[in-house]
Design a protein with these regions (language model features):
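Interaction-mediating elements
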Residues: 1-181, 185-203, 207-212, 226-228
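Gram-negative/organellar outer-membrane beta-barrel architecture
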Residues: 6, 164-330
Length: 330
């Protein structure tokens, strides 16, 4: 592998992490030497370390302003008495408590795990200091990058509301809902501090539009039907409104079929969807010597979808069709 200072530093960091995550809290890299071989085609790397001994955790406590019930906060303490000290578990605990405070609106909370080391007993007493800061509220929710989709299509997916406490869970849930629409290649959420305040943020969602439609054509052949041609066009974000519109056409020697479908995913503000489809089919059975009559059929369906959870819907669909038989050539 080709030598680079950046790779060496990365390797040294990985080495430190390996030891710190396995109880060696006093691990230290004493020195590093890099020497070039006489033929100048390779290098020797010598790393001198002090491994130290393993340290056990004795106590794990919380301190500071505990705004969430302490019994609940303790569930996020990943280290327990008697376990080997692990820096990654300290970091994960800090992140989990910070995220939990973010759910309650404490966007700028800080959590620091402070180890008290007893070198004689080879133990560590951990104390997590919690500073929730002020509860934060959302001033505005803004959208960027939606060059095709109108703002309302994005805004109705929001679970985080303006003027409400900023919940990291609701902000993330809103981001996921935008992704599920299928209109965007990427969705990012960013909390932006409002100048002159320490308890207000703006939430900015940046999206990258992608194609939300499809067009297709088909050609086939069957002995009785002859050449079969088909075409369809489906747009799931029609004119940027979030509504679904589709048309289809199939034609052969003895049958023609035309169809149209439409879905409004927000027929009501609560997210109840309504859709309908219609079709017309003309079949000339005389063309394939089956019968001396033609059937014209008109039909359609109407459907409703009711959201019962974030990812599930209850659907209802009804349909009907009316065939008309007439003599061939009539």
């Amino acid at each position: 592998d080709k030598y680079s200072r950046e790779k060496l530093n990365g390797g040294l960091e990985n080495l430190s992490s390996y030891y710190l995550d396995r109880g060696y809290i006093r691990f230290n890299i004493d020195s590093t030497q890099v020497a070039i071989t006489p033929d100048r085609k390779a290098v020797y790397i010598t790393v001198n370390v002090t491994e130290g001994e393993k340290y056990k955790v004795t106590t794990v406590d919380l301190s500071g302003d505990i705004v969430v019930p302490e019994s609940e906060m303790r569930a996020y303490l990943l280290l327990r008495d008697g376990q080997d000290f692990s820096q990654v578990q300290v970091t994960n605990t800090e992140e989990m408590i910070t995220q939990r405070l973010g759910v309650e609106g404490y966007t700028f909370a800080k959590v620091n795990g402070i180890p008290e080391i007893d070198d004689e007993k080879k133990t560590v007493a951990l104390k997590f200091f919690v500073d929730p800061g002020k509860r934060t509220y959302v001033r505005r929710i803004e959208f960027r990058g939606n060059t095709k989709s109108v703002d309302e299509v994005l805004r109705r997916e929001m679970r985080q509301m303006e003027s409400a406490p900023a919940s990291s869970a609701q902000i993330e849930q809103s981001r996921v809902r935008l992704e599920r629409l299928g209109f965007f290649k990427e969705v990012k959420a960013e909390n932006v501090e409002v100048p002159g305040t320490d308890d207000m943020i703006d939430v900015q969602y940046t999206v990258e539009e992608q194609s939300s439609g499809s067009i297709g054509a088909s050609v086939g052949y069957a002995q009785d039907a002859g050449l079969i041609l088909g075409a369809n066009l489906q747009q799931n974000n029609f004119l940027g409104t979030g509504k679904q519109v589709g048309i289809g056409l199939n034609s052969s020697k003895y049958q023609d079929l035309y169809s149209f479908n439409y879905v409004n995913p927000y027929f009501t503000e609560d997210g109840v969807s309504r859709g309908f489809s219609v079709f017309y089919r003309s079949t000339d059975l005389e063309e394939i010597n089956v019968a001396s009559y033609t059937t014209d059929t008109v039909g359609g369906t109407m459907s409703f979808g009711y959201p019962i959870s974030e990812t599930q819907r209850l659907g209802l669909r009804v349909g009907d069709h009316r065939p008309e038989v007439r003599a061939a050539g009539a």
